[in-house]
Amino acid sequence: MFYQTIYPTYQVFVALGVSCIITLVLMPLFIKLMKKEGVGQQVRADGPQQHLVKQGTPTMGGVVMLVSILLTCIALAQWNTDLILAMAAMLLTGSLGLLDDIESVAHGRSLGLTASQKMAGLITISVAFCLAAVNIWGITPIIAFPGGLEINLGILTTTVNLGGNVLSIPWLYLFFVFLLMAGLSNAVNLTDGLDGLAGGCVMVVMIFMAAVAFRYGESSLAVFAASIAGACIGFLWFNSYPASIFMGDTGSLAWGAAFAALAVLTKTEVVSLVMGGLFIIEALSVIIQVVSYKATKKRVFLMAPLHHHFEKLGWNETKVVFRFWIISGAFAALGFALYFQLH
């Protein structure tokens, strides 16, 4: 709408500010609505005891953030194929998270959809995204590593003729994109366990991803990433300790999918794993804990994900959050530095 009247560099900063402002304006109204309807977070009974006071805190704040991002991109971004693909991945995964949140609230429990239901949704979304990225946007099924190493994941490709149109199905790359999108979505979701933790970490990563997208020549994706960062900044005003609202799976699953989509569309699939290193560590802590307990009946961590381990060690919630923000920023900066080894 207004993208032609604003210099591309400024679009990114304006998008961050506009998305932040929209979130700041709409979130109080949403919090009031959630309180009126009695929609609140269900807290794990086996979690840290100090978290029990969070029971009933309004949730699904990710809805407002998604609306803010969509409105910002409508106003400031050029809607080309790459933006449509990234937006679709985010909104569809956010919708999956919304269903999970609704299920959780409706049944008064901390768990919503079953693991198989979530996985089926993530498989569908990631496969559709990958096929569209390869066949419509022309993304090559090659992953690049810093230093020049490249691995071709298109060596096992099936072509299907659909009424004169050829559909390429790169099986290895398809599986890789599924792992990336499902992995990052769940990793961000696992990180969302303390007030301000996931929102702050996503904000930091998306600022760096906006810089990556802009340097890659994708100004629309830069606006998209900046609008997510802006929405996170606005959200943190209400989610900082003690939180007035949580983003819910609506937000956490959506940000992971958006991160994965940006990584694929800017061909930074490997570097993105470094930039999102904090999310990866959080997810790995859960995997290690589960595997260790099943194999030896012993736990490696006092509690998983990792942020709860440090709470159990006596760190207060805000100290864990701020230190994890610093770690997330360090990983994002390292990934950004490695990006220059790709291009």
Q: How should each PLM-predicted stretch be described?
A:
Residues 1-35, 65-98, 102, 129, ...:
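Alpha-helical transmembrane segments
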Residues 31-48:
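Membrane-interface loops
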Residues 44-57, 110-122, 307, 312:
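Juxtamembrane helix-capping/reentrant segments at transmembrane boundaries
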Residues 79-87, 106-121:
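Membrane-interfacial loop-to-helix junctions in multi-pass inner-membrane proteins
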Residues 95, 119-128:
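Hydrophobic alpha-helical transmembrane segments
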Residues 104-113, 142-153, 162-166, 316:
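Membrane interface segments of multi-pass transport proteins and intramembrane proteases
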